[in-house]
């Protein structure tokens, strides 16, 4: 895919600035299609498609969790691991305000506000991951090691979907 065939988002600018190699994938976005939609379109395992989930704690402070597409986050376990009382999903408006991205197009790269990033630890064992590139219908493929540029903290909070 040539450079002219995919969007240049804040995430792409971030990846380029860090000299991170990535493979762009553009697909037909479908409202509420989630990671399963991309996995189906690209013929990739949904387990390797990583969700970027924006959450907030009891103090209304934002955080991001990167999770396998075929798993859910145990917010109870996450709160325990982080020493917090309560964690819940951020509203779509709040997530957009913090990240600069629309829900369905949220990337952990190039966020408007630097939020703490937490990575489900089993993601590191994958050979390749597919994560949102900062726009609905746009995914970037890369090695999981590239997530280290986000200075993430490992967590173990995945539960079966």
Kindly give the residue locations of the regions a language model identified.
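Extended, low-hydrophobicity, polar/charged segments
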Residues: 1-161
